[in-house]
Amino acid sequence: MKQVLRVLILLLVRIAGLPGARAAERQARAPLPGAPRILLVRPDHLGDLVLTTPVLYALKAQMPDAHVTMMVGPWSSEVVARHPAIDRLLTCPFPGFRRGKQGLIAPYILLVSIAQQLQRGQYDLAINLRPDFWWGAALLYLARIPRRVGYAIEPGTPFLTHALPFSAPEHATLSALR
């Protein structure tokens, strides 16, 4: 039942988000602005978030004028709360990473709610840093972010504009730096 519900909701997300995503993707054909607004999404717990921090330095080295927002779970926000490469920190109680029971529909209600909030951020680029996080890819799609980067792992791939190949045996830090 849960699997069928997810497939149906993923289909609805694609259909509902299509007009906004198409309009956002047309914007993506233009070069990034000089000071792009970038959103990084990493829902994981402490260890995986620590392994992602080299990405922050690499991103700021490549785009020093970028405004970088990072969205993490409240359980790991202290890891990057004072990181010099982050201009803004957002927290989200990502489904699948929270402990305790949650309703069958609750993750999808949260998806729409957070996507609406992210639309106000007017991001030029978003990077989903967790390889198998379809919810994050769908979030970026519904938020109408023009350039959505993540790993080519189903069922999240259709929500991305740039799907990167994923190599499972690769160390998490190296994978994130790609």
Which residues are covered by each model-predicted region?
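Catalytic machinery of carbohydrate-active enzymes
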Residues: 1-178
